[in-house]
């Protein structure tokens, strides 16, 4: 499915972090993040996930860094409430072009 194609872009040892994770917790593994996404998809249907801005950066300390902003629309399955919200995603890439770092920032409280 679409999620399989999404995860093909990630290295097997990729680390996933963001505001969904408590400050003192380690980043999630690929399997842990996949499970968390499946839990989310049990509660919500994704209507759209549209990129509105993307920028490639190269810093001395961190090469191959991409930051993007997305406009996401979801429908809560329990009551069909539609919510549209912004998500900022930062990705770091390895030499093979696979994503090794995924950091997503969005306000989960907007779904309440």
Name the predicted role of every residue range:
Residues 67-96:
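Exposed beta-sheet edge and beta->alpha loop/turn motif
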Residues 7-60, 64:
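A solvent-exposed, acidic/Ser-Thr-rich amphipathic alpha-helical stretch
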Residues 100-112:
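Low-complexity, intrinsically disordered terminal/linker segments enriched in charged
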Residues 1-6:
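Short helix-adjacent coil turns
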């Amino acid at each position: 499915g679409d999620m399989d194609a999404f995860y093909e872009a990630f290295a097997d040892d990729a680390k996933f972090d963001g505001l969904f994770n408590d400050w003192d917790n380690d980043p999630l593994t690929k399997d842990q993040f996949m499970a968390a996404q499946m839990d989310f998809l049990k509660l919500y249907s994704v209507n759209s996930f549209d990129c509105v801005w993307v920028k490639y950066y190269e810093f001395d300390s961190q090469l191959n860094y991409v930051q993007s902003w997305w406009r996401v629309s979801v429908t809560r399955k329990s009551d069909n409430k539609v919510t549209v919200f912004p998500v900022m995603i930062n990705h770091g890439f390895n030499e093979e072009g696979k994503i090794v770092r995924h950091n997503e920032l969005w306000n989960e409280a907007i779904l309440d």
